[in-house]
Structure formats: C-alpha cells, structure tokens
Amino acid sequence: MFYPLSSNTWGEEEVAVFQEVLGKGRFTMGESVKKFESAFADKIGIKNALMVSSGSMANLVGLAALFYKKNNPLKRGDEVIVPSISWATTYYPLQQYGLKLKFL
C-alpha cells in the first residue's frame, strides 16, 4: 500500500481561477477579493466580511474589532488568558493594544 507524503489539493476549477486572478496583476484588494468578501458574507448571513492575508493579520483585525467596538469590551490594561506555547503572532497583537498577557 502506498501513502503519498503530499498531494495536489487543487482541482482544475481552482487552478483556472488562480490563473485568472494572477493574470489580472492585482490579487490583493482587487475585484476578485471584493466579490469573494461579498459572497462569503452572504453565505454565512452577515452584513460584511473582510479577507486578510494571513492568520496573523486575522488575529490583529479581530482584536481591533473588539478593542474599538462601541461598548469597548477590551480596554488597555485588561488581562487576556493565552496559551503558554504558541506563536509570537498570538501575543504581539495583544501587547500592541496594551493588554496584559496571562500565560497558562
């Protein structure tokens, strides 16, 4: 029995879309991203969606959304529980907003 260490996870349809977007020369903040954000928001039943470049950016944007929300659920100096073992990108956005890290 053979188990490959890796395999291609992209189908022909996905590859064609990648090529189309790359061929336009603008694959960040372009029309394709705008369409995806709108379709994603519709699919999950929300008003707006925001596509970001990485999980690290998603952490930062999500934290900013909580920090600047009208009822301000997070304030500078608040304590946030975080895992002791994680990536630096878990911690940096929290420190950037002046939150205190509590490692578990």
Each PLM stretch: what is its role?
Residues 1-75, 96-97:
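Conserved PLP-binding active-site segment in aminotransferase class I/II-type PLP enzymes
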